[in-house]
């Protein structure tokens, strides 16, 4: 809907229209070829007759104001001799009395003058003009018989910047035949001729943009040379136009005049001297829209299209700053409300303010001119907490506790892995000990680790005060501290009627999908809890959308509707089947919002300079160790993935390919491990995912009499800490054979300095957590991390997928890890079209999977032998390395593929 025009705008438009008509009339006259002086004189009488009709005043006695004349009669010939003009070249009655006498003397005139169209010129007149060509008398007679032209308007001419002349007017030219008779003053007139129009002329125009002007024209080699000769030249490769400073305007126009093949229309608001005229420019009616975005804790940026009105508004702000790199303006937060209020007064500008969530989070910056530093958080009084715990806190850990207390015990503690989130969470919970009982929800593999941590750091607690729920029949409120796993929490919903005021959620990224059972069970608890402490080393495992549940758990009033969050931070797109929230946008603003109101995150590089950096290396294992039969199985599995199948069948084919990769890499992995032992490596970790690979590694270490431990999904939680201590205190060659998914959290192996990944995993967060089993507090050596990659396997597609996901985390400030920058030999990508197709399937399967744990369960329970029927031949392919029944050790389970991506219909439970 267009905006209504104001009275001033209508007046300006009407003035500009009149000026345009005048310029158009002058242009039409200029385009007509000039004839000789006598020819112009011959046509002049007819023109003068018409002009005399137009300039005669209406008869006073006629109410309609129309004049009447006889058809075909010459008005000058019918006038009395006394009234005919002689000395003056033109005639017009000057008074009402003279006009009345004139009309009375012409009483026989009967035809009315219908319109001011030009009269026709007879052939006799044209012949007469030719016969008198070049004679002064003919010109004088013509000039003497010409009546006075239209009365001129000196004010209009002054506005137009053109001098007033006594010759023919613009309207005179427009309504005549486009010819102009020069003033002779009794002397012979020279013939005026114009050069013929250029046959092939390149036409263009100049357009004003602020203090510069640009030229819109096609390509011309000579013109380009002229452009390059001007010092203020600037070429825009995107629009393919040249622009210059106004100081070069005159030089450009003079140079273009010398080019015979170029015609350039000048600027309308600039005269021949290069300066501006007094013509007022019409107001800009272009409607522009924009929005505000946060770029720091103190400043915000405006993303909006170009408009002179907007620029004028920006220049009214005292804190304005223009960034030439981004070509955007930014201001202090304290001027946000002022800018928005003034923008609403402009009808052609729509500027969206910062979301209400941001204005609430940064309320102090919006009201104050001074910015409060994050380091100004007051130190909390921890005198009521056990002295042993307080004395063991590092300075940055004590700052984390103070930050949490300043947020009233509601935060997402997202410190990097290995920085002691557990001890900080226990200290925060102990500060609110009067509000206990305490509920601690953790992954099942670290339940007993948390029990030992409470007994270690809080001597005031007795073992009877801690209740670890082991089965679904256990009591959730039996102790002062109650520890339960995510899976058991969903089975104890009936016992959740008694609210907990203090809740700790370890690895809170497990709650990334509201559709899962564990999330539905945890959300009601967090809703009624007074203190909520979320712990996560990787708060956004894959996509910013996965942060939403954690944000509303800490701040229920932030983004009550997920759609608003998705539009701003997930690059939400509407597709035929619904909204897609899998993207990411405004990650910098999201990071600032989280750090200000929800999240505290410190990286190892920020707080522990003595902690050695990780040194990653991608090792391409010898493909010759892969047997021919294994290669054939891989090729067959890859071929099955490229066929047109349903989504369920594609995921099953993907799992087959994933399992075949583990089987094919067994000889290569074992060879690499034996080489490490022979080279003098004493203690290191080996991570794998498939049971067939873990079994093969453990069997080979037993055959070589190498001391080792093994922790996988079948290892009881109570035994894992003992195995970890056994490895830490061991001497000599010791290898820890670990499952990527079962031993990637809650365990410390800081006595080792090398981690070997025999397999890759699609989720980079899981890989980073596994790395940090060694890269933890207490580590004094440089940590080496080796990723074993085999060409022609699933590694071809998993490695670039990991790099892409870790890049998104880095942009959001949620990971300091960059596989591309910190890993040696990263140029390992798919090459042929078939590989690209398979990579797309990997990417779609793992990104569309709303819950990695559901897909992980399907991968763990997938029985390769029941699908391929080749378990009996596997031992022959692998020689002495594998057991005959290695592929059939896992009990068959029901395959499950559950995906939860229906974010568009989700509304915050708060």
Curated annotation (Swiss-Prot):
Residue ranges for the region (Mediates interaction with RPA2) are 2-30, 5-30
Q: Which residues form a coiled coil?
A: 3-28
Q: Which UniProt keywords apply?
A: Acetylation, Coiled coil, Hydrolase, Nucleus, Phosphoprotein, Repeat
Per UniProt, the short sequence motif DESH box occupies residue numbers 506-509
> Which GO terms of type biological process are on file?
DNA damage response; DNA repair; double-strand break repair via nonhomologous end joining; regulation of transcription by RNA polymerase II; replication fork processing
Enzyme superclass (EC): hydrolase
> Compositional bias of type Basic and acidic residues: which residue ranges?
7-29, 97-107, 150-160
Principal localization reads nucleus
Q: In this chain, where does the modification N-acetylserine occur?
A: 2
Which residues hold ATP? 415-422
- Posttranslational modification: DNA damage-regulated phosphorylation by kinases that may include ATM, ATR and PRKDC.
As for subcellular location, the record says: Nucleus
Spell out which residues are annotated as carrying Phosphoserine. 117, 164
| Protein task | ATP-dependent annealing helicase that binds selectively to fork DNA relative to ssDNA or dsDNA and catalyzes the rewinding of the stably unwound DNA. Rewinds single-stranded DNA bubbles that are stably bound by replication protein A (RPA). Acts throughout the genome to reanneal stably unwound DNA, performing the opposite reaction of many enzymes, such as helicases and polymerases, that unwind DNA. May play an important role in DNA damage response by acting at stalled replication forks.
Tell me what this protein is called.
Answer: SWI/SNF-related matrix-associated actin-dependent regulator of chromatin subfamily A-like protein 1
């Amino acid at each position: 809907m267009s905006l209504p025009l104001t009275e001033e705008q209508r007046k300006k438009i009407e003035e500009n229209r009149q000026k345009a008509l005048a310029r158009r009339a002058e242009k039409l006259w200029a385009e007509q070829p000039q004839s000789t002086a006598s020819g112009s004189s011959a046509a002049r009488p007819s023109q003068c007759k018409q002009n005399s009709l137009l300039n005669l005043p209406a008869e006073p006695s006629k109410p309609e104001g129309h004049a009447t004349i006889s058809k075909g009669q010459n008005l000058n010939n019918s006038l009395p001799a006394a009234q005919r003009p002689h000395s003056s070249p033109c005639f017009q009655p000057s008074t009402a009395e003279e006009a009345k006498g004139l009309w009375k003397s012409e009483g026989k005139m009967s035809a009315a003058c219908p319109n001011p169209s030009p009269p026709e010129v007879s052939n006799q007149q044209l012949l007469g003009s030719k016969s008198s060509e070049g004679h002064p008398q003919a010109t004088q007679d013509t000039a003497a018989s010409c009546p006075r032209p239209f009365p001129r308007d000196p004010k209009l001419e002054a506005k137009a910047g053109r001098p007033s002349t006594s010759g023919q007017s613009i309207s005179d030219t427009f309504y005549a035949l486009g010819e102009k008779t020069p003033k002779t003053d009794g002397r012979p007139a020279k013939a005026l001729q114009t050069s013929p129009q250029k046959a092939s002329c390149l036409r263009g125009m100049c357009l004003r943009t602020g203090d510069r002007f640009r030229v819109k024209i096609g390509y011309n080699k000579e013109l380009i040379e002229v452009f390059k000769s001007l010092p203020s030249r600037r070429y825009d490769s995107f629009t393919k136009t040249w622009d210059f400073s106004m100081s070069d305007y005159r030089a450009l126009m003079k140079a273009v005049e010398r080019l015979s093949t170029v015609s350039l229309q000048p600027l309308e608001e600039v005269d021949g001297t290069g300066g501006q005229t007094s013509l007022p420019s019409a107001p800009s009616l272009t409607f522009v829209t924009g929005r505000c975005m946060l770029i720091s804790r103190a400043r915000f940026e405006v993303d909006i299209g170009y408009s002179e009105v907007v620029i004028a508004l920006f220049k009214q702000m005292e804190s304005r700053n223009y960034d030439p790199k981004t070509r955007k303006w930014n201001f202090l937060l304290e001027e946000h409300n002022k800018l928005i209020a003034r923008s609403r007064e402009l009808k052609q500008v729509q500027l969206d303010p910062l979301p209400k969530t941001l204005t609430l989070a940064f309320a102090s910056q919006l009201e104050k001119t001074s910015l409060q530093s994050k380091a100004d958080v007051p130190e909390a009084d921890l005198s009521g907490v056990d002295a042993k715990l307080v004395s063991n806190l590092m300075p940055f850990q004590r700052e984390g506790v103070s930050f949490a207390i300043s947020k009233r015990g509601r935060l997402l503690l997202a410190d990097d892995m290995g920085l002691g989130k557990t001890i900080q969470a226990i200290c925060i919970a102990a500060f609110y000990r009067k509000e206990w009982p305490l509920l601690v929800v953790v992954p099942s593999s670290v339940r007993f680790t948390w029990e030992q941590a409470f007994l270690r750091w809080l001597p005031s607690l007795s073992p009877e005060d801690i209740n670890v729920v082991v089965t679904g029949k256990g009591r959730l409120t039996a102790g002062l501290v109650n520890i339960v796993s995510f899976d058991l929490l969903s089975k104890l919903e009936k016992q959740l009627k008694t609210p907990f005021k203090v809740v700790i959620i370890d690895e809170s990224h497990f709650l990334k999908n509201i559709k899962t059972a564990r999330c539905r069970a945890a959300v009601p608890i967090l809703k009624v809890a007074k203190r909520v402490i979320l712990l996560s080393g990787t708060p956004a495992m894959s996509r910013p959308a996965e942060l939403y549940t954690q944000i509303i758990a800490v701040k229920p009033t932030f983004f009550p509707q997920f759609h608003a969050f998705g539009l701003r931070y997930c690059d939400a797109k509407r597709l035929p089947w619904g909204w897609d929230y899998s993207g990411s946008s405004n990650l910098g603003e999201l990071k600032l919002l989280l750090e200000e109101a929800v999240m505290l995150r410190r990286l190892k590089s920020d707080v522990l300079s003595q902690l050695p950096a990780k040194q990653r290396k991608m090792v391409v294992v010898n493909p010759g160790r892969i047997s021919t039969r294994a290669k054939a199985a891989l090729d067959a599995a890859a071929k099955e993935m490229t066929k047109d199948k349903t989504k369920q069948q594609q995921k099953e084919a993907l799992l087959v390919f994933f399992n075949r990769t583990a089987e094919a890499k067994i000889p290569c992995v074992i060879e690499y491990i034996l080489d490490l032992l022979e080279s003098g490596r004493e203690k290191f970790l080996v991570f794998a995912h498939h049971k067939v690979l873990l079994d093969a590694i453990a069997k080979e270490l037993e055959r070589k009499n190498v001391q080792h431990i093994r922790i996988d999904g079948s290892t009881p939680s109570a035994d894992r800490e003992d195995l970890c201590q056994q490895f830490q205190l061991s001497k000599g060659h010791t290898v820890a054979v670990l499952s990527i998914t079962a031993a990637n959290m809650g365990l410390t192996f800081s006595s080792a300095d090398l981690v070997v990944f025999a397999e890759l995993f699609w989720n980079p967060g899981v890989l980073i957590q596994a790395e940090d089993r060694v890269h933890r507090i207490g580590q004094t050596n440089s940590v080496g991390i080796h990723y074993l990659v085999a060409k022609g396997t699933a590694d071809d597609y998993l490695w670039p997928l990991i790099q892409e996901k870790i890049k998104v985390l880095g942009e959001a400030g949620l990971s300091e890890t960059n596989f591309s920058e910190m890993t040696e030999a990263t140029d390992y990508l798919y090459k042929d079209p078939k590989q690209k197709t398979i990579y797309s399937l990997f990417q779609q399967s793992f990104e569309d999977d709303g819950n990695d744990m559901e897909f992980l369960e399907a991968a763990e329970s997938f029985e390769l032998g029941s699908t391929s029927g080749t378990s009996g031949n596997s031992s022959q392919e692998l020689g002495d390395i594998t057991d005959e029944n290695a592929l059939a050790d896992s009990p068959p389970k029901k395959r499950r593929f559950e995906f939860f991506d229906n974010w568009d219909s989700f509304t915050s439970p708060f």
